[in-house]
């Protein structure tokens, strides 16, 4: 059998789903190949989406016309906005989801996406002709031809799971690994490596003593992941927290000789910011306890996920240690925690479009690029899908800058700096956090995606109405004058200083004690104007208030970003033989030859490139 498509996507995880949907929605005839149609969009580890910096990425995916935010809102069983005590640049949405419903929500979307066909099979070989990816062959002997291939294979490439001394081949528990595909790619010159991740035990909730834990409730305000205001339909559930203790740690320490992480069985590097419980007790031997979070797997299941107890120790040691936690003294588990090693490809071999520099029309996204996390995968997936479509049908490459999106920061870090451990996004990785807030992802990105043809008319009209309402509030605040005598009693009741003379409303709103909501009731004209906003009123008010209170910081950060843009405009790719530039340091020559940066700004971000190296390049360019 022989099939022809514009775009083929290999793997239906979070990167693959977004890539396939983006390419198909833009008009490419697309085929999504997955080993198991019942595992589309599977949450391989914790049943949650979002978190610090990750939540911003999900909102960016949504603003671009992707689906992770919509799927999350439809299947959320608990929502929280993290970092509320900090400024809005740090606010990050997070939701617990129903794992089973999450899969079926994704499948329903994909099965109803025009131009998209799903095929259940395992890809074994990438077909490359004259340096271009032209198709794939599957284990069933089916050949698929395409103009572009997007590889989103997650942890399945030569996946190997570890529980104690026991090793099992597979990409996830009870699921087969993918063989031969890595080798069919590396034979063309692409470099591969190995990484490791892990997951904790899954618990039978009927065996837990909930009265011995602290509850953690969600929030029920207006916040969502999607800007399309998807209502929450599922029952909102609690999470719980508890702690390990010295008895737990002692059992774990005795089991270390049987730990694949410490007996030499696992050589790959795992995620720094999601360490196993055995790594925690070795790295922090003086810490008497570690916090654990018990998270529901769904609305109608007893299965619970134990966040904070990732482990690859033998099953009996995991269980014995957990039973020393009072809430788990009668614990029953569904399956143990395990570690998994898998292949990834050096992301410095990619362009910012996520197309390979070595094999034309081959795109890579997700964990195959050395990242960890559903959100990071989804963000890469939508960019890869967009650019695969553009490669097929023509147009300018679509990339996002570091001042435009966390997705832009993520991809620039990958292709410029590379990875030596699984990469996770944090707000600290972004230079322009106040420009990349979760509340304005639509303002930043939706119009660009609309011009691409990815965002539909209804979403674009949503953006336009929101922008108009936000500007209306800000314009009113800038022009409306307030007399001191009419507002001073209200100001005093709100805990802020009285006025000595009249002022503009915006001057009051810049006070920390004053919000749009608490002052509007004292200014009838302002309240009447706000009452005219009927569509997503709370979201509009929040967006306007952030812009009013933080405008000075926003302007300052934009000015810094604009200065960096001048370096972004200086293109250097193909202009130098770095090896012959003796005025550069040896390290700089080696790094510049490897990365081959597109612009001077990208060169400046390469680890090991000093300001003096950049000055050398500027001089050679005649600047």
From Swiss-Prot:
Its cofactor is FAD. It comes from the Bacteria. The gene is mnmG. One of its GO terms (cellular component) is cytosol. PANTHER family: GLUCOSE INHIBITED DIVISION PROTEIN A (PTHR11806), PROTEIN MTO1 HOMOLOG, MITOCHONDRIAL (PTHR11806:SF0). InterPro entries: FAD/NAD-bd_sf (IPR036188), GIDA_C_N (IPR049312), MnmG (IPR004416), MnmG-rel (IPR002218), MnmG-rel_CS (IPR020595), MnmG_C (IPR026904), MnmG_C_subdom (IPR047001), MnmG_C_subdom_sf (IPR044920). Belongs to the MnmG family. NAD(+) binds at residues 270-284. NAD-binding protein involved in the addition of a carboxymethylaminomethyl (cmnm) group at the wobble position (U34) of certain tRNAs, forming tRNA-cmnm(5)s(2)U34. This is tRNA uridine 5-carboxymethylaminomethyl modification enzyme MnmG. It is found in: Cytoplasm. GO terms for molecular function: flavin adenine dinucleotide binding.
């Amino acid at each position: 059998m022989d099939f022809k498509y514009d775009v083929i996507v290999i793997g239906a995880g979070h990167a693959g789903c977004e890539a396939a949907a983006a390419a198909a929605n833009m008009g490419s005839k697309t085929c999504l190949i997955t080993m198991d149609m019942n595992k589309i969009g599977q949450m391989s580890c914790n049943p949650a989406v979002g978190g610090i910096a990750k939540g911003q990425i999900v909102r960016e995916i949504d603003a671009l016309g992707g689906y992770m935010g919509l799927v999350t809102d439809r299947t959320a069983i608990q929502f929280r906005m993290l970092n509320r005590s900090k400024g809005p640049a740090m606010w990050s949405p997070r939701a617990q989801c129903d794992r089973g419903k999450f899969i079926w929500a994704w499948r329903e979307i994909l099965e109803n996406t025009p131009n998209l066909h799903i095929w259940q099979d395992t890809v074994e070989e990438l077909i490359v002709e004259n340096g271009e990816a032209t198709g794939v062959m599957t284990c069933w002997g089916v050949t698929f031809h395409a103009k572009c291939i997007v590889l989103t294979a997650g942890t399945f490439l030569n996946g190997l799971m570890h529980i104690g001394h026991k090793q099992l081949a597979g990409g996830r528990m009870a699921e087969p690994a993918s063989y031969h595909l890595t080798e069919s790619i590396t034979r063309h010159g692409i470099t591969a490596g190995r990484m490791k991740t892990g997951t904790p035990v899954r618990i039978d909730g009927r065996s837990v003593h909930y009265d011995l834990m602290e509850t953690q409730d969600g929030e029920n305000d207006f916040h969502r992941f999607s800007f399309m205001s998807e209502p929450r339909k599922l029952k909102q559930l609690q999470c719980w927290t508890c702690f390990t203790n010295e008895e737990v740690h002692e059992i774990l320490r005795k089991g270390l000789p049987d730990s694949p992480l410490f007996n030499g069985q696992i050589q790959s590097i795992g995620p720094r910011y999601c360490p196993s419980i055995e790594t925690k007790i070795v790295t922090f031997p003086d810490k008497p306890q570690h916090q654990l979070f018990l998270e529901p797997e769904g609305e109608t299941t007893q299965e619970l996920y134990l966040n904070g107890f990732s482990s690859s120790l033998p099953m009996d040691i995991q269980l014995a240690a957990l039973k020393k936690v009072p809430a788990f003294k009668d614990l029953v588990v569904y399956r143990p925690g395990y570690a998994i090693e898998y292949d990834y490809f050096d992301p410095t071999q990619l362009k910012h479009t996520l197309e390979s520099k070595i094999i034309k029309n081959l795109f890579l996204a997700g964990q195959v690029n050395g990242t960890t996390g559903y959100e990071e995968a989804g963000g890469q997936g939508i960019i890869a899908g967009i650019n695969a479509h553009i490669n097929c049908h023509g147009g300018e490459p679509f990339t996002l800058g570091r001042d435009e999106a966390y997705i832009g920061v993520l991809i620039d870090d990958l292709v410029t700096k590379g990875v030596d451990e699984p990469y996770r996004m944090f707000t600290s990785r972004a230079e322009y956090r106040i420009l990349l807030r979760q509340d304005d992802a639509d303002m930043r990105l939706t119009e660009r995606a609309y011009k691409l043809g990815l965002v539909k008319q209804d979403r674009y009209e949503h953006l336009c109405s929101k922008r108009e309402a936000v500007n209306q509030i800000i314009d009113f605040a800038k022009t409306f004058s307030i007399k001191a005598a009419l507002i001073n009693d209200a100001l005093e009741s709100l805990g802020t200083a009285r006025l000595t003379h009249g002022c503009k409303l915006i001057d009051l709103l810049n006070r920390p004690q004053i919000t749009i909501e608490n002052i509007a009731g004292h200014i009838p004209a302002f309240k009447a104007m706000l009452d005219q906003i009927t569509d997503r009123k709370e979201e509009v008010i929040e967006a306007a208030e952030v812009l009013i209170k933080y405008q000075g910081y926003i302007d300052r950060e934009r000015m810094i970003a604009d200065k960096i843009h001048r370096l972004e405009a200086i293109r250097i790719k193909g202009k130098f033989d770095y090896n012959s530039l003796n005025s550069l340091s040896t390290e700089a020559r080696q790094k510049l030859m490897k990365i081959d940066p597109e612009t001077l700004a990208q060169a400046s971000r390469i680890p090991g490139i000093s300001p003096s190296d950049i000055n050398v390049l500027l001089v050679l360019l005649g600047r």
